[in-house]
Amino acid sequence: MTTLNSRDRVLKMFAGEEVDRPPCFSGMGNVTTEGLKALGQKFAATHLDAKMMAAAAASTYKLFGFECAVAPFDLCIEAEAMGCEINVYAHSEDLLYPT
């Protein structure tokens, strides 16, 4: 079998096809503190800026080779769409997901 690229490896795995090796990815959020540090971003701020979201999501692939770039920033989209305000915990240095 030829070596697959990251995209094909993940898609073939989901299709139940043979892959050259198991893909290393998470279907859930995978933003890391190392990625945020490298970008100079705070986790809370990433929830409010599309470019920061994309950069944070891509950082895990760029730094660690994970075969995905998942933006875990949609957790409150339904509530926001209905007019609710979210709390991104801007005061915290921890990785706290909005509520």
Q: Each predicted region: which residue ranges?
A:
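Catalytic cores of TIM-barrel enzymes
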Residues: M1-T99
